[in-house]
Structures are given as C-alpha cells and as structure tokens.
C-alpha cells in the first residue's frame, strides 16, 4: 500500500513562528511512517516559501527542521509549488497569516485538503473581538470587556473602561495567540502602556475584566460530529500565563482531567461544542475557560490551531481520552480529506 503524503507548513510571518516550529517538529516525530511520507516547507518571516526536508522514516532525536539559520536561498520556491495531487497539508501555523483564513484560502485555491478549520471560521476565531460577539449570540458566558480600535480617543477609552470594569484588567491584541502581546494592568497608567504595547501587534485591542479563576481547557475534534475531551487544567507557578511562561520558562504544569465537579465538566464540554458549531469550525479546536471562585464559568478563548507540541494541552487531552498522538494526527488527516470532498461537492 502506498503511503499518504503529508505536507507540513511551519514557521510563518507572525510572532508565534517559534511555537510553529516546535509543533511541526513534534508532528514529524510522532507520525506513523508506515502510513505517511512527510514533506516539510518553511515559511519565512518575510513570507518566502522554502522547501526543506522530506522524511520516509522517523527522524533521529538530534535532527531538527530547517529554519532561518539553516535554510539556503536556492531552496526558495513559488508558494504554488507545494501542490501535489493527493497530498494533505497540515498548516502547523499559529497567529496571523497562519490561522486567520489566509493560508486556508490559499490551499483552497490550490484545491488541496488541509487540516483544520475553513476560511470563514478561521477568520472569525482569530479575531478575539469578533469571536466574543459570535459567542454572545450563542448564549455562551464570557467575562466583561471593552474594545479599543486604533485611531479612537485613547483617553475616552480609558475612562469608559474604568466605568465598566475594575482593575486588574487584561489587554490583548485581537489577532494574536499564545499570549503574545498580552499584559495585565492594575492602574490607568499601566492600562495605557498595555494598550500601546498591544497596538504594536494589532490595531484592534480587547480589554477584559480580570477574574480570580482557574484556567480549564477542552479539546474538540471532528467536523459535523464534533467530540470533546474531559477538561484539563493549566496549573501555573506564575501570576500570569504569558508567552514566556508557556514556551520558554516551562513554569506551568497540566492536570488531566481537571479536579472540578461533574456539573462544571458537563457545562464546559457543552459550551465548547456549542462554540465550535457557532463559528462553523471543523477539524480541531481548543476552548479555554475560566472557572471563577464562585463557580461561574466563562469561555475565554477558542483556538482553531492550538499548540501541537508533544507537551501541549491539546494532544495530551486526547491522549487521556485514549487517542495517541500518532492516532490524533491520522484522524485529523482523515477529517481534512472528508471536508475537502464536501467542499468540492458543494462547488459542482
């Protein structure tokens, strides 16, 4: 039986490109090489597509994917050169130009099956402000928030925020993930600085009420028949779960399943599945919840391309459900092929 070609796209133009490389390296090591032949393409920070490595068997522990430090100019290709009939693309890309609908649209133009959510759903989920408005319409509870758009009167925004929220608040670029550009503010001075920092990443800024809460996450897998995992908990050794804590300092651990009551578990899984359907997602997603000290549940974020390293919450949640990392990748490829056939059928 011939092997299925799996194309990994990694790197990318966003500030989350380092996470992308870590995720792609984990995938290339976990793949069942009796079933898959893996080709890899690096997208540089300036948007060039670079043909990197191919793997017909599991790479050695010391082998790394090529990145900015090791690529050669002659390896650059036209983006459309990644096309290969019958191949499935796994865009292991995070943040803008990765999970915002851009690469998804490109792959649909090429008529290639790809892992993950479609153009519209990716675009909606990438923008935290738009996501909140969609989830509000679906009746899913969220923390109170205000919005600042670049060019608006900043002093007025500060006054309006202080009128409806209380410190501390969290300031987030609308279009970034992995906690990039997010700050905690406990005064007007800190809020102003946090907004200015967030503006270096995006022109749309979300300001959320801080809550004393546990951080609980639920994994989602499927197309129209979405399934959810038991919730897992992010156990922090730091005050704020930022990019540094997540990926560099390793100052977090995970409890799977989370030590919460059955009622909260059921509610979170229901909210997660409802959110997945509300944005029209497919393939995979991860819903991040806050569980307040009063038992109140808030859906904080819906991530359509969650971190996919071997130590990331998403694959660990499914491993607890009995689906190994390699089996998870295989199922995502199957779901990608299923959605591709459905999309193509709709065009006939």
From Swiss-Prot:
Disulfide cross-links: none
GO BP, sorted A to Z: cell wall organization; peptidoglycan biosynthetic process; regulation of cell shape
Binding site for ATP: 162-217
Isomerase as UniProt keyword: no
Entry EC no(s): 6.3.2.4
GO cellular component: cytosol
InterPro entries per the UniProt record, alphabetical: ATP-grasp, ATP_grasp_subdomain_1, D-Ala_lig_Van_CS, D_ala_D_ala, Dala_Dala_lig_C, Dala_Dala_lig_N, PreATP-grasp_dom_sf
GO molecular function: ATP binding; D-alanine-D-alanine ligase activity; metal ion binding
Cofactor note: Binds 2 magnesium or manganese ions per subunit.
Catalytic reactions of this protein: 2 D-alanine + ATP = D-alanyl-D-alanine + ADP + phosphate + H(+)
Keyword line: ATP-binding, Cell shape, Cell wall biogenesis/degradation, Cytoplasm, Ligase, Magnesium, Manganese, Metal-binding, Nucleotide-binding, Peptidoglycan synthesis
Positions contributing to Mg(2+) 1 binding: 288, 301
Location(s) in or outside the cell: Cytoplasm
Domain of life of the source: Bacteria
Associated pathway: Cell wall biogenesis; peptidoglycan biosynthesis
Chief localization: cytoplasm
Similarity remark: Belongs to the D-alanine--D-alanine ligase family.
Function in brief: Cell wall formation.
NCBIfam families: D_ala_D_alaTIGR, PRK01966.1-4, PRK01966.1-5
The protein's name in its UniProt record: D-alanine--D-alanine ligase
């Amino acid at each position: 039986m011939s092997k299925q070609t799996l194309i990994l796209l990694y790197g990318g133009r966003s500030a989350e490109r380092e996470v992308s490389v870590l995720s792609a390296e984990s995938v290339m090591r976990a793949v069942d090489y009796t079933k898959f032949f893996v080709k890899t393409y690096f997208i540089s920070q300036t948007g060039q597509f670079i043909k990197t490595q191919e793997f017909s068997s599991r790479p050695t522990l010391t082998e790394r994917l090529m990145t900015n430090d090791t690529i050669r100019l002659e390896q650059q290709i036209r983006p459309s050169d990644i096309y290969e009939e019958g191949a499935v693309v796994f865009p292991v890309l995070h943040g803008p130009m990765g999970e915002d609908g851009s690469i998804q649209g490109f792959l649909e133009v090429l008529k290639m099956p790809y892992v993950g959510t479609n153009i519209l759903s990716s675009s909606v989920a990438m923008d935290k402000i738009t996501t909140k408005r969609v989830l509000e319409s679906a009746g899913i509870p969220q923390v109170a928030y205000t919005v600042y758009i670049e060019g608006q009167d900043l002093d007025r925004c500060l006054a309006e925020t202080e009128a409806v929220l209380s410190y501390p608040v969290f300031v987030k670029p609308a279009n970034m993930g992995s906690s990039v550009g997010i700050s905690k503010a406990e005064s007007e001075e800190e809020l102003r600085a946090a907004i200015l920092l967030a503006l270096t990443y995006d022109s749309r800024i979300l300001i959320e009420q801080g809550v004393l809460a546990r951080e609980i996450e639920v994994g989602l897998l499927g197309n129209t028949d979405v399934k959810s995992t038991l919730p897992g908990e992010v156990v922090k050794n730091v005050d704020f779960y930022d990019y540094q804590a997540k990926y560099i300092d390793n100052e977090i651990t995970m409890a799977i399943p989370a030590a919460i009551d059955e009622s909260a578990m059921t509610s979170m899984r229901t909210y997660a599945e409802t959110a997945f359907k509300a944005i029209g997602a497919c393939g995979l997603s991860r819903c991040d919840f806050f569980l307040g000290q009063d038992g109140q549940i808030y859906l904080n974020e819906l991530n359509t391309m969650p971190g996919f390293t071997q130590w990331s919450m998403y694959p660990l949640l499914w491993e607890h459900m009995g689906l190994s990392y390699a089996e998870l990748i295989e199922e995502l490829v199957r779901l990608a092929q299923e959605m591709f056939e459905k999309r193509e059928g709709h065009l006939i």
